[in-house]
């Protein structure tokens, strides 16, 4: 089986380890910088090219950076059109990059989450804060990684100031979320790895 790892960081530890494991299972593996891929959309013969050659593969492992989500998932979709197996499909990747969409899906599935509210109207701030139990409150952008765009507002005044600043740069209110502050978490969260609908590993992450 020929496997392609889509990664713009071929030298990254995680990418190299994935390649090592694929080889251990006896498969051929190639690391491809998806930002350098280009595609042809055709009804009968959709293609993906890299360095002038058609990529003919059996499976892909997408490692799509958050700042390349739109282009990266477009390349993944192109492989999906060919019937190529993908470890993470384009829909799952897109959903995971939108915190609001993720929260809605988790809540629908019955998974416990912090109380979360959103609105695009600054006049709703008072009611939003009341709905999640007041301050302190977590305010975050729906799209962001590594803690960027996340603020802990200790008071109502601080929360209003942060929200008003965020609203100035985000006309679409779904880009801004307010969440109840879970004191007991103390900057910790749990990351779970799900394969085939089952959690196969987990880790606790502690903010510095």
Give residue spans per PLM region.
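Rossmann-like NAD(P)H-binding beta-loop-alpha module
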Residues: 112-134
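ATP-grasp fold ATP-binding core
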Residues: 106-107, 129-148, 170-185
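Short hydrophobic segments within beta-strands
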Residues: 6-8, 195
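Phosphate-binding site of ATP-dependent enzymes
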Residues: 152-208
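Short, hinge-like loop/turn segments at secondary-structure boundaries
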Residues: 47-50, 103-107, 132-134, 155-157, ...
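Structural detector of well-ordered beta-strand residues that form the stable sheet scaffold
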Residues: 86-87, 114, 138, 177-179, ...
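Extreme N-terminal starter segment of soluble prokaryotic enzymes
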Residues: 1-4
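Conserved N-proximal alpha/beta basic substrate-recognition cap immediately N-terminal to
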Residues: 8-115
């Amino acid at each position: 089986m020929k496997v392609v790892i889509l990664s713009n960081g071929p030298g990254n530890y995680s990418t190299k380890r994935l390649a090592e494991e694929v080889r251990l299972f006896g498969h051929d593996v190639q690391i491809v910088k998806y930002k350098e891929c280009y595609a042809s959309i055709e009804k009968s013969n959709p293609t993906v090219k890299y360095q002038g050659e058609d990529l003919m593969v059996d499976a892909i492992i997408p490692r799509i950076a958050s700042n390349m989500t739109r282009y990266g998932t477009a390349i993944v979709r192109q492989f999906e059109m060919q019937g190529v197996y993908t470890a993470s499909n384009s829909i799952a990747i897109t959903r995971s990059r939108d915190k609001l969409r993720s929260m809605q899906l988790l809540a629908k599935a019955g998974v416990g989450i912090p109380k979360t509210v959103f609105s695009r109207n600054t006049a709703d701030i008072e009611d939003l804060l009341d709905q999640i139990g007041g301050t302190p409150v977590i305010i975050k952008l729906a799209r962001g990684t590594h803690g960027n765009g996340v603020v802990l507002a200790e008071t109502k005044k601080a929360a209003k100031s942060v929200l008003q600043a965020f609203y100035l740069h985000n006309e679409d209110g779904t880009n801004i979320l307010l969440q109840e502050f879970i004191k007991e978490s103390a900057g910790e969260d749990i990351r779970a790895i799900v394969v085939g609908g089952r959690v196969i590993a987990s880790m606790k992450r502690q903010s510095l």
